[in-house]
Amino acid sequence: MKSAVLAALSALNSCPMQPNITVRLQRELFDAAAEAAQLTRGRSDVGALVQFTGICRGAEEGEPIAALTLEHYPGMAEAEIERHVGEALARWPLMGVTVIHRYGRLSPGEPIVLVIAASSHRAAAFAAAEFLMDYLKTRAPFWKQVETANAANWVDAKATDDAAAERWRERDDAAE
C-alpha cells in the first residue's frame, strides 16, 4: 500500500508512466527473481534494473553466528522507508522501487533485505539502490541482535555505514 506522501512524490517523478513501488516488511522469505519480474511487468521503458540482496552472515568478527534477530517499530518503519523511497524518486528518474525487509529470527545464509531500483539507465538505478541501502543500514527503525554460542548482543550502526550515508548529505550540501 502506497502512502499519500509516496503517491505525491511518485507523481513528481520525471518518468512518463507512474513508478511501481513496493515497500514491505515480513517474516517470510522473499523470492528476489519474482519481485524483479513484478517490478518490471508491463514496462518497456526499463533499461536498467539494479538488485541488492543482503544475506545473514555466518560469522561476526570471526565468531560463528547462531542467529540474527531483527525487530522493528510497526507502522513507523514502513512510513520511514516509504519516505526515503520518495526521496529516491525525487532524486533520480526511476520507473520503480522495491524494498522488502525481513524481521524476526533469521539463520545464517537467509536473505534479510531486498532493494531493487528500475530506471531507463544504469547510473540512476545504481545510485538509487545504493542510496536506499545506505539509509536502511543507518536510519531505518530496525534493531539487530546477533546471537552467538556465547552471547546475544544488540548491534549499533557501524561508523563505515554512517560515513556511507553521510556522503548523500554532502552531495546535497554541495548542490545548494
Please give the residue ranges for each predicted region.
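N-terminal, polar/charged subdomain of small-to-medium soluble alpha/beta proteins
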Residues: 15-112, 126-130, 134-176
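Short glycine-rich or small-residue beta-strand-to-loop segments that form or flank ligand, phosphate
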Residues: 112-119
